[in-house]
Amino acid sequence: MGVPTPARRARLTFGALLAVPTLLLGGCTVSPPPAPQSTETTETTPPPPPKAPTQIIMAIDSIGPGFNPHLLSDQSPVNAAIASLVLPSSFRPVPDPTSPTGSRWELDTTLLESAEVTNENPFTVTYKIRPEAQWTDNAPIAADDYWYLWRQMVSQPGVVDPAGYDLITGVQSVEGGKQAVVTFSQPYPAWRELFNDILPAHIVKDIPGGFGAGLARAMPVTGGQFRVETIDPQRDEILLARNDRFWSVPAKPDLVLFRRGGAPAALADSIRNGDTQVAQVHGGAATFAQLSAIPDVRTARIVTPRVMQLTLRAQQPKLADPQVRKAILGLIDVDLLASVGAGDDNTVTLAQAQVRSPSDPGYVPTAPPAMTRDDALELLRDAGYVSEPVPPPDNTADDPPPDNGRERIVKDGVPLTIVLGVASNDPTSVAVANTAADQLRNVGIDASVLALDPVALYGDALVNNRVDAVVGWRQAGGDLATVLASRYGCRALEATPVATAVPGPATTTSQAPTTTTTTTPPATTTPTPTAPIPAPESGELVQAPSNITGICDRSIQPRIDAALDGTDDIADVIQAVEPRLWNMATVLPILQDTTIVAAGPSVQNVSLTGAVPVGIVGDAGDWTKTK
């Protein structure tokens, strides 16, 4: 083969250059897709619609006066229910007929890893909070919340039976706030009933109204299985939603709606049609029979955790004589007041003991026989009171007013006047107070009703003696020794400075604080003036009086103390002190609130026999809607 000439080499080189792009283009060409096998058009399946939230509707009478479970003025069945579902608790009540109150308190392991007595001298309880426990705003549930609740229960007037909190000398925060070390001035066997329905301290302390009034119509932050979505006072509705930030087992229902059930016929139709699944309402025999007749609907009657009382304030000079107090209470028809307090056609559960409530397993009526009107008026005459005709009003008309025979009871020319104080946000208590005043006016006592804001009623009105008596609810289902000490004890008579172990929550030390004892007033049987409570901003912790009767019986105080520290059996103590409490004639128990509960066939896991403090909603997180 010969060597190419220059012309031939040029032609070969040019041809090679033309071939390279052709090869490169051929190597980058994408293969065409396979031929379609069918000419039919493929339709895209739309995603399934979102699942509708599971909502369980519970019928109620009203949403109640407020949502702070620790205030006397806010006690209601709905408040107890809401608190148990949205607020964290150290312990939860479960039914136990062998206990003095019918409930046993078990550790809530969703909030606490443990809670135990870690020292006997001083008596100390250590609460270990789960690290993941948090409020719905992401703030941790911590020892600061325990500290805040203790301080409020000691210093605020009008709280629920605070004798246990009054024994605390310090709450210390350790382990970054996830341990609360609580020291007491003495042993307290009922410590498991403290620090339940815990409030978010970082929210409540700053909202308008604070602890005493800030939760009247709102629950902005919660820490339970549910959170409060909306509260509509006008429609009497509360909507709870599952708390997606809850760190333990989530609630099964997405939503629980508490709403007004309406008239018995409307409620029956709603349950019959499946619009309402659960109900807790007041009603009589007709309502109960109407609901019970609906196929597959379960019904029962349960008592709620509140008892209504009328309390006379014996430190008022006109009420210092026990015979006068006995006469006033003897002139009141308790059966009538109970009927008014129970509502139209509702079954009445009379309360006829000073310490125990009708729901307590050991309850027996201890009330003395009812006094006749003549006997009561005789007691007033023995105390120096007389009846005289009511002077006619100034009348310039020609015709004098008719003589209706009305008389008034006076002493030294001064009429006997009684001002009944009542919380203005509680229409039931207002109605009972008005009826009691009517009864007293009918016999010549100048009785009137003063409806006040709850903060003013239990604070300024008691301190400045603006009221002679208080009509309202007390909590039922709690520790009996604590009830006895809170309502009748000499230690609970006056505003008393509290010596505390630490000034506030500490977060850097793990050493338990040393304990100092609380200063207590001397026991007395004479009326005791109520001292003013220092302003909260003063920083001083002062125990507010919870015994609003104004007197105590020092002869039974050692038994009260022994019951509180567990060295004396509470049943024996109650048996010994009940006659003396009745003889003091300061507290007139009226009734324990009773409701009808019903559950329809479309909801499962609803127990109609829950523990008294929480009622039937204690297990609402497990309720399941079947259709």
Curated annotation (Swiss-Prot):
Comp. bias (Low complexity): 501-528
Matches recorded under Pfam families: SBP_bac_5 (PF00496)
Signal sequence residues: 1-27
Matching InterPro entries: SBP_5, SBP_5_dom
Metabolic or biological pathway, per its Swiss-Prot or TrEMBL entry: Phospholipid metabolism; phosphatidylinositol metabolism
GO biological process, one term: glycolipid biosynthetic process
Domain of life: Bacteria
GO CC aspect terms: membrane
GO molecular function: peptide transmembrane transporter activity
SUPFAM superfamilies recorded: Periplasmic binding protein-like II
Region ranges (Disordered): 29-52, 385-407, 501-540
ATP-binding is among the record's keywords: no
Record key words, sorted: Lipid biosynthesis, Lipid metabolism, Phospholipid biosynthesis, Phospholipid metabolism, Signal, Virulence
Function: May directly or indirectly regulate the accessibility of the key branch point intermediate, monoacyl phosphatidylinositol tetramannoside (AcPIM4), to the elongating alpha-1,6 mannosyltransferases which could regulate the lipoarabinomannans (LAMs) biosynthesis.
Family named by the database record: Belongs to the bacterial solute-binding protein 5 family.
PANTHER family from the UniProt entry: MONOACYL PHOSPHATIDYLINOSITOL TETRAMANNOSIDE-BINDING PROTEIN LPQW-RELATED, PERIPLASMIC BINDING COMPONENT OF ABC TRANSPORTER
Protein name, UniProt field: Probable monoacyl phosphatidylinositol tetramannoside-binding protein LpqW
Organism: Mycolicibacterium smegmatis (strain ATCC 700084 / mc(2)155) (Mycobacterium smegmatis)
Taxonomy of the source species: Bacteria, Bacillati, Actinomycetota, Actinomycetes, Mycobacteriales
